[in-house]
Amino acid sequence: MENSEKLANSKEVIAYIAERFPKCFILEGEAKPLKIGIFQDLAERLSDDPKVSKTQLRAGLRQYTSSWRYLHGVKPGASRVDLDGNPCGELEEEHIEHAKATLEESKAKVATRRKEQAKKAREEAKAKKTARAATPPKRRPQPAAKKVEQPVETRALNADEITVGNNVSVNMGKGNMPATIVEINKDDVRIRLSNGLQMVVKAENLRS
């Protein structure tokens, strides 16, 4: 059983009638001018066809005859054809001029529309470029400047300042570190650093 579902749009209608009447309707290349009154012939031939209605046929035929392919085919020397491709007389000058004017008008509309679309695209691109230029780039935060520690001025201890329990500074090469004297043995002095570490240093390395 054949599928009797109706065709969805004019494009499908044109493809269908081109399949049914290939000598009349052409899908590729220059189309042939159609017989005047061909709609009635088409409606009669397809009156019992459940896939297409008269309204669909009229819309499909209108789209087919307004295409650039069809209008190009309406020219001097061309003959109209019926559904079976049989010649039905040459075109009249009036119809040729009308087709020519319609084609030129259609092409002009397309050219104008494309020009407007191109202009709109340029304006949108320009607007985006302007928006990007107006937005300042995000600045990266500058690293905080390292605080330069000023060296603490110290002096050598006097002999009477080298006593057990006295808080002193000891020169450790990388700088002076706080310490406490815990034992004295002539020039050797045992000290305890702030971290609890004990060590023996020369008295001359102790500072106040």
From Swiss-Prot:
One of its GO terms (cellular component) is cytosol. InterPro entries: ProQ, ProQ/FinO, ProQ/FinO_sf, ProQ_C. Residues 106-154 are annotated as: Disordered. SUPFAM superfamilies: FinO-like. GO terms for molecular function: RNA strand annealing activity; RNA strand-exchange activity. It holds the Pfam family ProQ_C. It comes from the Bacteria. The keyword RNA-binding applies. Residues 106-127 have a biased composition (Basic and acidic residues). Keywords: Chaperone, Cytoplasm, RNA-binding. GO terms for biological process: post-transcriptional regulation of gene expression. It is found in: Cytoplasm. Coiled coil: none annotated. The keyword Zinc-finger does not apply. RNA chaperone with significant RNA binding, RNA strand exchange and RNA duplexing activities. HAMAP family: ProQ (MF_00749). Belongs to the ProQ family. This is RNA chaperone ProQ. It comes from Aliivibrio fischeri (strain ATCC 700601 / ES114).
